[in-house]
Amino acid sequence: YITSNDKSFLSIGSGIGGLELIINNKFENNTYYFIERNYVSKKVKYGWGGVVNDEAYNNLRLQKEFLNINGLRDDQINIFDFDSDKLPENKFDVIISLLSLGYHYDFSLYIEYLKKVSKTNTRIIFDTINSSYFTKIFKNVEIIKSDLNTVHKSKRIICSGFIN
């Protein structure tokens, strides 16, 4: 779902950035933008329907150190604190949010932002328990993984082409 033509990635709630390191090991010289929160919630919450949008499990300084130690250069890393920074307005090739957007954070809170930072062919990869809902939002919705026998009972989907 990711090719060598993809150069600009937005990760929402990626934690320390391990997936982005794996992507960079295969396709080097990409640019990564991370939208994160810079604190650890007192109580860890798991489950769908995080409408309040107040959870976080990250330390942005440690995230940057981890990415640097594991081979990402400073010019590849752009970390944005959701609570204090203006979010990036670049157009991205791929947007990834695994078990975050739609899991901890309500997808509807981000629709307008995602439209603003998406190209016509941007692929958005995230997890959901209601994949059919997204056929009303995107022209293309494909289930790429199902975890129906897990606690999360989720489907990972890849979407592109906003309808409106």
For the regions a protein language model found, what residue spans apply to each?
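A short acidic, Gly/Pro-enriched loop at the edge of an enzyme's catalytic core
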Residues: F82-I95
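A short SAM/SAH-binding and catalytic strip from SAM-dependent methyltransferases
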Residues: D93-D106
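Conserved SAM-binding loop of SAM-dependent methyltransferases across substrates and taxa
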Residues: I16-E28
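Conserved class I S-adenosyl-L-methionine
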Residues: D6-G15, Y33-E36
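S-adenosyl-L-methionine
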Residues: G50-D85
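A short glycine-rich, Lys/Arg-flanked "PGG" loop and its adjoining helix->strand segment in the class I
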Residues: S108-T120
